Amino acid sequence: MPHYVKRRGRPVPGTIPDALGMFQAEVRFYREIAPVAGVRVPACYQADETDDGTVLVLEDLSAWRPGADPVLAATVLAGMHRRWEERAPLRWPWLRPVAAAADLVERLFSQTWARLRAREDLASSITSLGDALTGRVTVAEHAIAAAGPLTLVHGDASMLNMRTSPDGELALVDWEDVSAVPGVVDLAWMLTSSVDPARWDEVIAAYGPAGELARVLPAAVVQGLLSLADTTAGSAAAMDWISRLNEAARRT
């Protein structure tokens, strides 16, 4: 049976992967959490930290379709969040907390927004929200703490990190951002990164109670703007990001 081997070198000191211990966290996820998480993830055959970095030997899901139906994804995420509500941070105290490395994200956003703001393809609502977030990213990150009980979250629940089997089963991959924060954080990022605004209400309804979504959307917008900065102005990818960010701004 073919395997997928994922190797990560030692992160550069002072970078976000270094500050968050992202690569080590994924190793620990597969060692400690994956067997009991309650969601489908790739089977893990090896999860080690070495002198050179980390190595994972995982089930090969290359035959599965990239992405997932967002309604199904919302249902799967909600089930995991309910399962581990108020339990995850006690069972795995090493999980990343709310506002981890917020100062580094603040600095990165300030540098990026100064360049991104000049793009002509931004909607005025996005420009206004980006301006409002400048110098307040740390505040937005800490606001997440009031969005609900802490639980196990994927941390990067975009469609890029989901796979669908030929018979419709959904798997979550790439657990480098696994955290213990309010579950609505996963919903906010899935919407902002991946879901057509026309389906947001449908997806939110499938997730269930999400009354604090507006509280966490500003932090999701920060990450979305950083992602938008990596696109070419006027490209299809940029326009998709702008559409979703505009919806997030409208709901913030």
Q: PLM features: what roles do these ranges have?
A:
Residues 42, 209-216:
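Short, surface-exposed acidic
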Residues 92-143:
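Active-site catalytic-loop/activation-segment of kinase and kinase-like phosphoryl-transfer enzymes
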Residues 78-85, 130-135, 195:
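Short amphipathic alpha-helical signal-transduction/dimerization elements
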Residues 2-95:
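ATP-binding pocket architecture of kinase catalytic cores
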Residues 60-64, 174, 188-191:
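Short helix/strand-bridging catalytic loops that position acidic/His residues to coordinate divalent metals
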Residues 1-5, 139-185:
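Active-site acidic catalytic loop and adjacent metal/ATP-binding pocket
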Residues 19-22, 66-69, 101, 105, ...:
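Residue-level preference for long, well-ordered alpha-helices that form the structural scaffold
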Residues 28, 183-210, 221-249:
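Active-site activation/catalytic loop segments of kinase-like enzymes and analogous catalytic loops
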